[in-house]
Regions:
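Short helix-onset patch at the extreme N-terminus, typifying the N->h transition
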Residues: 7, 34-37
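Short, Lys/Arg-enriched N-terminal segments with co-localized hydrophobic residues
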Residues: 3-28
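Extracytoplasmic metal-acquisition and chelation regions
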Residues: 20-22, 30, 34-35, 42-363
Length: 363
């Protein structure tokens, strides 16, 4: 990765050229993965008994057959499903694929991941461009009775096209798509950052569980309704916070995966990159634009994503007049680990923490 020095800017042309080579390499890797899926699944069907590949842990065939195998790709799906299952969670093998801190956009499936997807009883996934490998794996799935929940399909017309706001740095990837297919639309995958979307998705999860396990239908319905009430209460707190805020604009010196969140509450934002961008270096133009917006709006903080390098935010601040803004982090839940879950992280707890950050950022 190119180093960023705060005492000078990296020329935009140089950054774009480097990003082009990075994206070209990533595209070749993705093609290799896609080409390997068919061969891999074919080998699996011959060499691995169906009953033994439901989970990564060593379980007897009898134990595995007694339990539903549910695979989720990311943390929000996992946590919603866990809550709706309630006491029934002990009778289900619930797996989260992205549990080691890798985010949705950079995840590359291993053999064990494809095995889990191929043989599970229920698969819950986002369904955006980053999940293309799942669509390919499903075509050769071993369990032909598998049920799936595609979040973007569940939300239908509620999903949003990716947007480039004023001052946002476009990547070579964006330009390539413009030239390849003028009619092709790209949609923002980060649907889980909206608690209103979460309520709709929880209904879909509960309904699917009811179909698969009708004897416990009332449990799933009750758990989903109780959880949705908690989501609704927190949603109202967010709205009240924004309505009473001194200003309603966020300055994001990073990728911006919070489009659904800000749209829910009527906030505005300026960001260095879109939520799905592969960029990691901001151009002189991008940095100076964001610094100018900080000065113009008089905001006291610059935001980044969780586990993000703060170099761009630091450089933006150093180019403002006051040079004393704080750096705050919003958690998009793209890289929650199994260790964090063991320590008590939940979708609601993360969104509550994000509300606290927003209160500081908007006031």
């Amino acid at each position: 990765m190119t180093e960023w020095y705060v005492d000078r800017f990296v020329p935009a042309d140089s950054i774009q050229q480097k990003c082009f080579y990075i994206e070209e390499r990533e595209q070749k890797m993705k093609k290799w993965i896609m080409g390997s899926l068919a061969i891999l699944l074919g080998v699996m069907s011959i060499s691995i008994p169906f009953a033994g590949i439901h989970t990564a842990e060593a379980k007897t065939t009898e134990e595995t057959d007694k339990k539903l195998n549910i695979v989720t790709t990311i943390f929000p799906e996992y946590d919603w499903t866990r809550v709706i299952l309630g006491d029934r969670a002990d009778d289900v093998n619930l797996t989260m694929l992205l549990d080691n801190g890798t985010d949705l956009h950079s995840f590359q499936p291993a053999v064990k991941d494809i095995m889990k997807v191929s043989s599970c009883d229920l698969l819950i996934y986002v369904g955006g461009e980053s999940d293309q490998w799942i669509e390919d794996a499903l075509e050769s799935a071993q369990n032909k009775d598998m049920k799936t929940i595609n979040l973007m399909e569940v939300l239908g017309d509620s999903i949003k096209e990716e947007e480039t706001v004023e001052g946002m740095q476009e990547s070579d990837h964006d330009h390539d798509h413009d030239h390849e297919d003028e009619e092709e639309k790209e949609y923002d995958e980060h649907v889980w950052t909206s608690m209103r979307n979460a309520e709709v998705i929880c209904d879909a999860i509960a309904e699917t569980l009811e179909e698969m396990d009708p004897e416990n239908k009332e449990i799933y319905q009750s758990n989903a309704e109780t959880y949705k009430e908690k989501l609704s209460v927190l949603d109202e707190e967010y709205q009240e916070t924004v309505d009473s805020a001194k200003q309603k604009t966020l300055i994001f010196a990073d990728r911006f995966p919070f489009r659904y969140l800000v749209d829910d509450y009527g906030m505005e934002y300026y960001a260095a990159f879109s939520g799905c961008s592969a960029e990691s270096e901001a151009s002189f133009k991008t940095v100076t634009f964001l610094a100018g917006k900080v000065d113009e709006l008089g905001v006291k903080s610059v935001l980044t994503m969780e586990k993000s390098d703060d170099r761009i935010a630091q450089t933006v601040i150093e180019n403002t007049k006051a040079k004393d803004q704080k750096i705050l982090q919003l958690n998009s839940m793209q890289s929650i680990t199994s260790e964090e879950i063991a320590d008590g992280a939940t979708y609601l707890s993360v969104m509550e923490d994000n509300l606290g950050i927003l209160k500081k950022a908007l006031n």
